[in-house]
């Protein structure tokens, strides 16, 4: 399914709308906030579904994905070392390899999300050769 593109906006994918619509209200609001912030920070990104979860790419390279789980949401910056480099900022959040867990009661700080998105976009572009 081709992503929809509004003038001056990030290309969006209706499958992400469907993914979010199936979530409980609190997770839906939380992940919609992540989605909106990614769109603001990376307006030329393409939104898609990869491995059953919303994902974003620039210049053909994935840079971020997220998912809802039973007890938390996760953001996957697709760079295991990036979360280690933000050790102070992610202290107190649950983590698994390559994922940062957050909840409606403990959302991601905007500054952290901004840093993760910007760094991953920069890294993805550097690897794509553009």
Task: Describe the role of every protein-language-model region.
Residues 1-130:
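Charge-dense, helix-prone N-terminal extensions
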């Amino acid at each position: 399914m081709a992503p929809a593109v509004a003038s001056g906006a990030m290309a969006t994918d209706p499958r992400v709308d469907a993914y979010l619509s199936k979530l409980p209200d609190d997770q839906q609001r939380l992940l919609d906030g992540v989605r909106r912030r990614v769109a603001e920070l990376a307006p030329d990104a393409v939104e898609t579904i990869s491995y059953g979860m919303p994902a974003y790419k620039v210049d053909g390279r994935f840079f971020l994905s997220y998912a809802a789980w039973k007890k938390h949401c996760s953001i996957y910056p697709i760079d295991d070392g990036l979360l280690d480099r933000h050790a102070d900022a992610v202290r107190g959040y649950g983590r698994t390899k390559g994922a940062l867990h957050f909840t409606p009661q403990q959302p991601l700080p905007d500054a952290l999300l901004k840093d993760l998105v910007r760094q991953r976009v920069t890294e993805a572009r550097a690897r794509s050769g553009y």
